[in-house]
Amino acid sequence: MIHFLPANMKHNKITDSDLATLTNGESNFVSDVWVNGKKIVDRDITCKNGYIHKVEGVMTSADNMADIVASHANMKTFNYLLGRCSAPYYDDAATKEYNRLYNNTDSVFVLRHFASTANTGNYGAATSGELAHDPDGQAVDAKLLYDPTWNQYIYSNTSGYDLHYDAGAMLVPSDKAFNTWWNADGKVLQDMYGSWDKVPMNVLVKLMNINMINTFSETVPSKFKNIVDNTTKVSLGLTTADVDSCFMGCNGVVYLLNKVYTPADYRSVSFPALINSNGADGIMSVIYWGIDNLNFEPYLNSMDSYYSLIIPTNKAMLTYVDPCSYGTNRTKLYRFTYNNQRKTVVANRYDYDLATGVVDEASKDSVTNADQVKDRLEDLIDNLIVVGNVEDGHTYYKTKG
């Protein structure tokens, strides 16, 4: 149950105008009390064995954020995109309880979203963790920030907070807003993939996650400036004028928007690598894995600086001469490849003759130390980032490395 109580709203600096937006104009004062979308019209009626609070209507259980999106007539596009990030998972505990109650022999499956914060436990034993594998145990291409179907969602924190302290929030563009964006700022995706069905998950999730907010209390309308791009941490510029209406769920609030905010990932120099990094079929999946996993995104997605990025293809990543082996008796060559099952980059190392350009295939040695792979990739990417442009006729340029 979602409670809007005066003391709590004061503590979280929720204003009268915030409450007006959240209740779609039904309340304008934080002195009001709201429980699950219903206003308390007479409170603290004292009885011999407790208190009665009179509400203005019949109070019903609230849907979660995913259910709100699924049932709204103007959120069909966002609901479809959410569905691409989900799968039904067999729940053994729920199956046993269901069959016990109904004397049946059926199986119970629970819809869950691939997410960095999700319920990884079974029925009756919720556990917060990362859901990074599909029901068959295969690693997924990308994850949402959190699972909007989890009724007990609370962001990961070190303060010991549980679901009673806060909730999530979702910015859901209307179908009309999505159609407008698809033919304007999103035209590059339309030109490359043709339809939403064909946009790869690792590309799509960038757009989804910019609309998923970990905390509700810190991002109410008066604090919209706190809603930032996931990588650049620059404010999106969301205003109440962009909000059509609000819907309170049991695990967070859903804001229906009349516009789509484009993630910085779609405008940065690394975008060509992103859209060519789709698993085993991507021709730049190796280098983009490095950009995505070695914390280069905040740097490359910055719109306040000008960079040039040299992007090697997967084929080029088979010919990396290890600079650490220069000046030694045996120069080493790395062949980096993308392991689509594990969703990670692996490498083999070979002896290499610099003079002849011949690789000694018999010297193949698998690099089992993941940190060594990351170290070489990080050094390489540092030297692929040029400060400024590379079109002014100079022979040498300053790199990040």
Language-model features: locations:
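Mature, structured domains of secreted/extracytosolic soluble proteins
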Residues: M1-G401
